[in-house]
Amino acid sequence: MISLAIFDFDGTLFDTHESISQTIKLTFETLLPSHTPPQSKIHCLIASGAGLADTFKALLSPEFTPTAENEWIEKYRALYATHGQLLIKAFPGAKDLLTELNSHKIPIAIVSNKGVAAVKTALERNGLEGYVPEDLIIGDKTPGAKRKPDPASFVDVLIPVLREKYGMDEIDSGRVLVVGDTVADVQFARNIKSRVCWCRYGYGDQRACEELKPDFVVDSLGEVVGIVKA
């Protein structure tokens, strides 16, 4: 049985595609109403798992200066909190899977490009508060964390917390399971030398993910339960 489960958020535990695309659209309508980014480009950026800075840089370049970056990200987050959160839904089977992990006392972590506050709000709004400890939710502004596939979120953030607060002195990466939907998630798992479950139902580029040969492939969160017990 695994000793730690690390979940991606967008496209893995939660269906957030509409919330992200609509909030990007609202951000442009607010800050640059003369320009509407093509939905196809937004979809590709979501599929790649790009963070907010990279997303707006791709949609705005060369106008995207460091000053503009802060303004656009702050506006996006404000709009996401008031509009985007209402469009987020947990994928079927999320609660059952987290309940199963909790019943076996398997620590659950979330490593996401989202802000921690947005992740916590989504969990609360969807009846999943308390399933994932707050100190195991890693977001884009978590000290020491770096965007996947960089292993820093695991090596420099999760491991110290697990040792200090959960008594996990020795963490065998071979018993860690990363669950995610994009190339970044699969590569992150490879970089920390864990096993990886690719969620084919998510937003990632299917051909690119398949080429990386993930250890497990699922079409629903319900299928992850069997992997956890193996």
Language-model regions: role of each:
Residues 216-220:
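Short acidic-hydrophobic, aromatic-tinged amphipathic segments that line or gate anion-handling sites
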Residues 113, 200-202, 221:
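Short secondary-structure boundary segments
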Residues 2-96, 103-104, 117:
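N-terminal helical cap/lid subdomain that shapes the substrate entry/recognition surface
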Residues 1-2, 7, 29, 99-101, ...:
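Eukaryotic N-terminal low-complexity, Ser/Thr- and Lys/Arg-rich leader segments
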Residues 95-99, 182-185, 200-209:
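Short glycine/proline-centered loop/turn elements that form peptide/ligand docking sites
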Residues 86-87, 115-177, 183, 187-192, ...:
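Substrate-recognition "cap/lid" segment bordering the active-site pocket of phosphatases
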